[in-house]
Amino acid sequence: MALVKICGLQSLEAAETAVNNGASLVGVIMVPGRERTVKQEVAREISQMVREKRISKGSKYLDSRQLRKEWDDCPLEDWFEYNVKEINSSGPFLVGVFRNQSIDEIQQAIHTHGLDFVQLHGSEDFDSYIRNIPVPVITRYTDNAVDGLTGEDLAINRALVLLDSEQGGEGKTIDWARAQKFGERRGKYLLAGGVTPDNVAHARSHTGCIGVDVSGGVETNASKDMDKITQFIRNAT
């Protein structure tokens, strides 16, 4: 089953709607001053909710750090498929999205808000950050900035790779043909950039991605739309 991440959440209601309909990852924006930046108290409420969901289902990974401990035995060619399977079966998990913030700031946010995953969305030195972040990391790439990278480069110590349009979070549709070629040459990835309830099924079948990430595509008037969240997850999976 495809992995679904609903991102840019700013309310417990929207996060619960996502989780109750099958999203394995829910994301909050931790970058200060953005349109979708989450309030600290809301981030903590969502963190508590996803942890309680994992406890109630007897999740294998109550602490996401346990996932990293099993990577040593996973062959590179199965890396991302393995992680998707484990996340889907053991989630939901909370992802904190950061952009060019310090490692210290990220570490503090993990502790304060109980983040399960970190997503790096800027020009960070990924290898350096990953070595110093205790939870699994998702790294984001644009579809026109991956030349020269191999599947092995992308897999090492990353939980997942996110392939996005140039202007992430603004609804700009990614070039699906380039996304398909990326997957053929460099392995599996999550697809973001312009996916909506109406096109997500086609996007998945056309690109071969192993999961999808959406924010603006499930909004109405700049707010998360519960019906769109529900329909998106249904169509994606």
UniProtKB/Swiss-Prot annotation:
Keywords: Amino-acid biosynthesis, Aromatic amino acid biosynthesis, Isomerase, Tryptophan biosynthesis. GO terms for biological process: L-tryptophan biosynthetic process. Gene3D superfamilies: Aldolase class I (3.20.20.70). One of its GO terms (molecular function) is phosphoribosylanthranilate isomerase activity. Pathway: Amino-acid biosynthesis; L-tryptophan biosynthesis; L-tryptophan from chorismate: step 3/5. Belongs to the TrpF family. It catalyses: N-(5-phospho-beta-D-ribosyl)anthranilate = 1-(2-carboxyphenylamino)-1-deoxy-D-ribulose 5-phosphate. HAMAP family: PRAI. SUPFAM superfamilies: Ribulose-phoshate binding barrel. It comes from the Eukaryota. This is N-(5'-phosphoribosyl)anthranilate isomerase. Its EC number is 5.3.1.24.
